[in-house]
């Protein structure tokens, strides 16, 4: 029986997601053994600065792809929001799993919703996308950077001077946290999610046909189509997890895709948002990018990048 080695990050969330993938494959009765290999990525190692300042794309992916390239692992399990918009030609995303809740949530110390937080409250996030939208909604609060895995951030909320933190609903739900922890689900009109948020990506070598066919059994067509549109938008904007870009797509009953894209200034003073419907997912991503670029989105992102390079 062939053994398939699956690589992932070392966090409890990453391991939970990977074990979920293995469970799904086992339920299909596939004739393989599975082994999990934990890999530490650059994004996991550097925790004393914000993600935007760590710089580069694929902060949580490159080391896992290196293990894939060398044959040390056969499959990489990623959170789709961590996957760069362009894959190297030697790799393929054989499956994108059905999306968990794509929204962000607010977890607050005193049970305050975003609108109820007192002026001057400190909100923790590691994302420029989240900070831009939080400050746009509540310019009277402060955003303070917070890094670490889910458990670390929840502990910091209790032990440090944060009034609230913003996390992905999907991660909390996969770890078993529920309404006793989540104060408020942030509507997508308030905080548009990251590209691919809530979906998992299963990556393998493009020449490994057997593994590609195996993983394809877990591909969710509707999620895949939506995420394709989002990633086309991200690619066209030349974005990554270190710039303030959001995007969320849904597939309508007739098969068309509705995509909303967002670019914001980190201080929240400018939020550009456009929505458009189309039948061809990747073309739609380009069209939404063009609409935002015409409003000045490119200039906002260029300013962010130059400030990051200078810091």
Swiss-Prot record:
According to its UniProt record, which reaction does this protein catalyse?
4 porphobilinogen + H2O = hydroxymethylbilane + 4 NH4(+)
The record, for Gene3D superfamilies, names: Periplasmic binding protein-like II, Porphobilinogen deaminase, C-terminal domain
**Entry keyword Mitochondrion:** no
Please provide the Gene Ontology terms (biological process) for this protein.
protoporphyrinogen IX biosynthetic process
Taken from the UniProt entry, a GO cellular component term is: cytoplasm
Give residue numbers for the modification (S-(dipyrrolylmethanemethyl)cysteine): 241
- Name the job this protein performs: Tetrapolymerization of the monopyrrole PBG into the hydroxymethylbilane pre-uroporphyrinogen in several discrete steps.
The molecule here is called: Porphobilinogen deaminase
Q: Which gene encodes it?
A: hemC
